[in-house]
Amino acid sequence: LQDAVNAIGDGMGTIQVAPGRHSDCAVQGAGDIAYVAATPGQAVFDNVACEGKGALVLRGRSAKVAGLVFANIRVPDFNGSGIRLEKGNLTVSQSWFRDSQQGILAGIDTASSITIDKSTFTRLGTCEGPGGCAHSIYIGDYGSLSVTRSRFEAGRGGHYLKSRSRRIAVLNSSFDDTAGRGTNYMIDLPGGSSGRIANNWFVQGPNKENHSAFITVAPEGKQYSSAGL
């Protein structure tokens, strides 16, 4: 996998991932790369992480991920992720993140956007680490985040979706905490955000660490306006 990423370099290309369980991981440092399952749902990145971070560590111009499964990813700092996004645009579709410390963890890139569609996040999150909780999705200070037609379920700690992005859209998705353990909020916007949260389905589970809210807005202070949210 890394050889294929290196071959594309600063250009544009598509990597087709064959069915099966893969112990490969890759770091993308440039270019625009699509990672596509040859058969959606049958290509699994299992128990593998590059740089002690995640199966795909992305810091190029853009990346697209389609039809892939990320499973059993754990690292010593408790932030093991299917995708670790450090900068650039990201589009994820028809993918499954499960049984890991985090699904997607993104850093800071206020000029870029993240789009997630038709994807599932199962048994993710942990509060084991000394640095605080990991979450199913945790997005840093990004330009925008869009999550549509996706499912979050059976969390294992932290929040289902935490985002510090300036703009947010969470539409037509489900958050089922019925089988969750030690979970917190469904959606946490710690610094505020503007946009739209609509047509979602929320089920509060019995084994939560925090039952106080489904959605929180600016609990850590107002970094961005939430006017019109």
Residue ranges and their predicted role:
Residues 12-14, 19, 32, 42, ...:
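Detector for repetitive beta-architecture
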Residues 18, 36-38, 46, 59, ...:
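Feature marks extracellular polysaccharide-active and adherence modules
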Residues 196, 202-210, 225-229:
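Glycoside hydrolase catalytic-domain groove-lining segments
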Residues 2, 47-57, 76-84, 99-108, ...:
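Extracellular beta-strand/beta-solenoid scaffold signature
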Residues 1-7, 19-21, 38:
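Right-handed parallel beta-helix/beta-solenoid
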Residues 14-19, 26, 30-78, 125:
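Right-handed parallel beta-helix/beta-spiral solenoid domain characteristic of secreted/periplasmic
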Residues 105, 113-114, 127-128, 145, ...:
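Extended, compositionally simple hydrophobic/Ser/Thr-rich segments
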Residues 6-11, 28-29, 58-59, 85-86, ...:
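Flexible, charged surface loops at secondary-structure boundaries
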